């Protein structure tokens, strides 16, 4: 059974085609700069990789290009072979506790949450409607980044603000990276052979968050009402004193919108280092003696350890600490600096395993809890959800 996973952005469409239930990746690609005369269409299947520059004016045209390419490259004979499409949707609010079939009613509910994620949800719906137009009556499922965190208790998701703000506007912690956390949590349970395991997962890419998980349920997470809350990231500030916004507005004569743009897109690694938002560039720079790059790195490491300590206390001890996503999977320095700060908990790295690749345990056998690296796979988790609902 062939299922497509889709991640639609405002000017991009990322997709992967899987043969299920074998979970075999058949075809993948990315369409960038949608709405431009020089859109970039990249695709990959088998040993073949292609890139084409061409005008792609909207998401409907992007989906048609994807579907046509599947037939042109003889990946499928006809569109009837595609049995379902799973869409990553960023914000499900309190309306969605699990993945859902994308009926007209559910699409309207997703659109009603646009205030909570104006850029993301709008783009996600463009992707949904584009598939509807190209393959009428195709079975589509929405898989939300927020639903994994719907198990968080009210004392953990509430802000100490006027309660009417929550009642009127649903201002609360929602958390993100939930699709990744679900995949990694399930995989960790398999490795530990313990469905009730208590783990802390550090999802560290350009966006960074942590999650305390018990029995495959989210207990708390570092991102909040938006992905800006939590630890410093590639371009996001993470937690700051809110009065800084008013202070900078007065000092630099900037609007709130301008300052929020700086906190989202010009802070984090980029803001502190002045070098880059990319962790790889930061590591090269700090190893070459750049003090601001070292500061940017150390500030992030310190804040991550703050959350690990908090969640360790919340869970009353853990079975494992898990690293995933870009930095989490690929940076041995990142992991080493964190574990060094946690050594008082009785956890130590095996340097050989820390410096190797792939899914593995990287802690020593005498460590008080295990440290794992598990490459995330959000696309697989999305198509699994499609199959679960379809069946």
Curated annotation (Swiss-Prot):
Paired cysteines (S-S): none
Alphabetical UniProt keywords: ATP-binding, Cytoplasm, Kinase, Magnesium, Metal-binding, Nucleotide-binding, Transferase
Sites where the protein binds ATP: 14, 203-207, 278-280, 326-330
Amino acids binding substrate: 88
The keyword Magnesium is assigned to this record: yes
Pathway recorded for this protein: Metabolic intermediate biosynthesis; acetyl-CoA biosynthesis; acetyl-CoA from acetate: step 1/2
Name of the featured protein: Acetate kinase
Organism encoding this protein: Phytoplasma mali (strain AT)
Protein's gene: ackA
């Amino acid at each position: 059974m062939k299922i497509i996973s889709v991640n639609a952005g405002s000017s991009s469409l990322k997709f992967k085609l899987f043969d299920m239930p074998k979970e075999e990746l058949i075809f993948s690609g990315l369409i960038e700069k949608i709405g431009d005369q020089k859109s970039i269409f990249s695709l990959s299947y088998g040993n073949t990789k292609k890139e084409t520059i061409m005008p792609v004016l909207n998401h409907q045209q992007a989906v048609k290009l994807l579907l046509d390419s599947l037939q042109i490259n003889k990946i499928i004979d006809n569109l009837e072979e595609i049995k379902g499409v799973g869409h990553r949707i960023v914000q499900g609010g309190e309306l969605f506790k699990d993945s859902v079939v994308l009926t007209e009613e559910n699409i309207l509910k997703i659109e009603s949450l646009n205030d909570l994620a104006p850029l993301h949800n709008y783009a996600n719906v463009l992707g949904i409607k584009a598939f509807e137009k190209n393959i009428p009556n195709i079975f589509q499922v929405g898989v939300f980044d927020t639903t994994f965190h719907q198990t968080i208790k009210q004392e953990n998701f509430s802000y100490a603000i006027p309660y009417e703000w929550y009642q009127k506007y649903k201002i609360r912690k929602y958390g993100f990276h939930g699709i990744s956390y679900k995949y990694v949590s399930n995989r960790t349970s398999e490795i530990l052979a313990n469905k009730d395991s208590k783990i802390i997962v550090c999802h560290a890419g350009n966006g960074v968050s942590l999650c305390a998980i018990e029995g495959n349920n989210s207990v708390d997470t570092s991102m909040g009402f938006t992905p800006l809350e939590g630890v410093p990231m590639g371009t996001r500030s993470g937690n700051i004193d809110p009065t800084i916004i008013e202070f900078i507005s007065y000092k630099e004569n900037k609007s709130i919108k301008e300052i929020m743009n700086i906190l989202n897109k010009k802070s984090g690694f980029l803001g502190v280092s002045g070098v880059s938002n990319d962790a790889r560039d930061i590591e090269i720079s700090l190893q070459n003696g750049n003090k601001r790059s070292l500061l940017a790195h150390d500030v992030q490491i310190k804040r991550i350890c703050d959350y690990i300590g908090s969640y360790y206390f919340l869970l009353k001890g853990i079975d494992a600490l898990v690293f995933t996503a870009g930095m989490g999977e690929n940076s041995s320095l990142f992991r080493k600096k964190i574990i060094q700060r946690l050594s008082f908990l009785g956890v130590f790295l095996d340097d050989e395993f820390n410096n190797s690749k792939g899914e593995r345990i990287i802690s020593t056998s005498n460590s008080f809890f295990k440290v794992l690296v598990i490459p995330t796979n959000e696309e697989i988790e999305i198509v699994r959800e499609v199959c679960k609902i379809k069946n």
